[in-house]
Each structure stands twice: as structure tokens, then as C-alpha cells.
Amino acid sequence: MNTFGKKLTLTTFGESHGKAIGCILDGVPAGLRIDEAFIQSELDRRKPGKSKLETGRKEDDKVEILSGVFEGLSTGTPIAMIIFNTNQKSKDYDNVKDLFRPGHADFTYFHKYGIRDYRGGGRSSARETAARVAGGAVAKLMLKELGVEIQSGLCEVDGIKGNVQDFEYAKSSKLYALDPAVEAAQEEAILTAKENHDSVGGVVLTTATGVPVGLGEPLYYKLDAVLADAMMGINAAKAVEIGDGVASTHFKGSQNNDEITLQGFKSNHSGGTLGGISNGDTLIVKTHFKPTPSIFREQQTITTHDEEVVCNLKGRHDPCVAIRGAVVCEAMMALTLADMALLNMGKKMDHLKCIYG
């Protein structure tokens, strides 16, 4: 499946070493001011090659809007956006065209489809997430009109955990670190792994404030369930926590319950959802990313002809995919919340009367 969402749908297309990648965002209400500079700035945050902590592949990621916008406003029709690939080096993958790279989707794609684009992983490459960020930027513009703000940052790298959640600091950090006190250690861990032809994992914290009460569609389209689905659909994501997540299994009910006052909740262990519906508190999501599977070490694998061989990779790869993954997490949260906002419009007669009355 290449489409995400119910009322607001994002369909992406393209491959890592193809001519272009892009998306079609359908369901955006007419009359939304489309800030193209903002969309580009979001792509610039995710684009590769900004520092030695990222892949050496340099792409401008310049986005072009093809449809759905007239005189700066959304028209209510599908918004199509395209990003042309300009820095492919497909020859780097000639030596792996007949073998399966450990940790990658090569093995499963080949056995599912009987054919695969071996150049940079083709459709399974994280390059595709640029299209998600473009669509997510439009969703952010929608949510801004509703007073919703989404932020993210790395709270852990290679087991080095931060204790501070400074989202303003993360905006200027090369690795989107939330805790300045551990940023240097986290950066050193990434660079050391890179020097040793290895990679590291990380954890991204994504939050949303200003979320209205009532978003989420029980029982099978709950807000927390869809957020988990959205994050798990990102390349290299291996686990998702909502609120206190796994830690809540170690609490007593008396510790885990968020008591309620007329001023609001006294705590936020639930992470902003109850019964799969937003409760008005801050949405809190942690996404755990595995180490980048592309490492420059000899590894055992097999070929498409069932031969055991040694794999030696080439190319340009992120030593820690979680860094740029933070921007993608924001995009997926934005798409989820914007979709939920549209779905919620018809849940009360009062809502319909406001529109049609």
C-alpha cells in the first residue's frame, strides 16, 4: 500500500535512484494558504548531506507543486508535488544487484515481487520519506490554523539518554539533540561508529501541543493506534511508545492514572490519549530506530541464485538514520492529526449545524 490516511490521504511515488519522488495529497480543504517557502524549509531540515553525521549524498530536494494550488491557496483538489533526484550514483550498487544486503528489504521485496530495484533499495529506501515530509508540511499548515504545534528531537542515541527535553535547542542542533548535556557524547558515538564502518540507533521524541479534545475514531482507528502505525511505517522504525509506554507496565494503577481537575490533568502518563481519543493534553510519542543496516563491513549473505557469498557494501549512507528520521516523525504526526481533525467534523450535530446551519 502506498497511501496513508482516510479523509486526508497521502500517496507517494518514486524510488531512490529513479528520476523523481513525489506525492499526491488529497482532501486538503479549499482556502488554505499554501506557504511554499515553509514546505521547502521542512524538506531542507530532512535533506541529506548537511553534516558529517549524515549520508554524503547531497540532494537539493527542491519541491515543485504541480496541482491543487491557485494564487497561493489550496483549491480543494489533489495537491501534487514532485522532487527530482539529482545526485544518484547507481554504479555504487552494481556489486549487490544479485545479492541480498543484510538488514535491508532486498530479501523480502525479491521474494514478494520476484523483482527488485537494487539501486539504493529502490522504493524501500528512506529517500521516499522526502515525499512524506512535503505532504506533512501541508498538514502542518492546516494544523497551525487550529493552534496545533508539532516538535521533535532525539532523546537517545546509541544508548546515551538525555534527561532534558529542550525542543528549541534541538532546532539548532546538528543531530536534533534534546539535551545539550549529552549532545557531544551522542555525536561522538555516531562518528566513532562511522569511523569503524558501523552505525548506531536512536530514539526520537515527537510531541503535539494544542490538540483539541476528541480526535480519534474508536475502535479500529484510534488516535494512538494510528500514530503507532504512522511511525512504524517509517524506514528503520522498530518500536513506538505512546506516553510512558513500556515504563507504564512497571507502575501501579495509582501511579499510572492521570488525575483530573477543573484546570486539567495533574500528569500525562497516557501521552495525550484516553480510549484512543485525544484528551487535550500534550501528545507524546517515542519512535525507536534501529542502526542503519548499510555498513561497510564484510557480512555473510546469499544471492538470488541461492549461493552463499560475502557482502561488501559501497555507497553513501547515514551512520544514524534517527537524526533525519525526526523530521519524518513530525510529518507523520501532522498527517495523522490533520486526517483525524477532518474525520471528527461530522461526529456531532453541532458541528454540522456550524457548517450548514
From Swiss-Prot:
Assembly description: Homotetramer.
Documented EC number(s): 4.2.3.5
Source organism per UniProt: Sulfurovum sp. (strain NBC37-1)
UniProt pathway: Metabolic intermediate biosynthesis; chorismate biosynthesis; chorismate from D-erythrose 4-phosphate and phosphoenolpyruvate: step 7/7
Cofactor note: Reduced FMN (FMNH(2)).
Name this protein carries in UniProt: Chorismate synthase
Residues engaged in binding FMN: 123-125, 235-236, 275, 290-294, 316
Entry GO MF terms: chorismate synthase activity; FMN binding
Record function comment: This reaction introduces a second double bond into the aromatic ring system.
UniProt-listed Gene3D superfamilies: Chorismate synthase AroC
Catalytic activity: 5-O-(1-carboxyvinyl)-3-phosphoshikimate = chorismate + phosphate
Family under the similarity heading: Belongs to the chorismate synthase family.
Binding site for NADP(+): 46
Record keyword Lyase present: yes
Biological-process GO terms, alphabetical: amino acid biosynthetic process; aromatic amino acid family biosynthetic process; chorismate biosynthetic process
Keywords, comma-separated and alphabetical: Amino-acid biosynthesis, Aromatic amino acid biosynthesis, FAD, Flavoprotein, FMN, Lyase, NADP
Entry's Gene Ontology cellular component terms: cytosol
Pfam families: Chorismate_synt
The protein's required cofactors: FMNH2
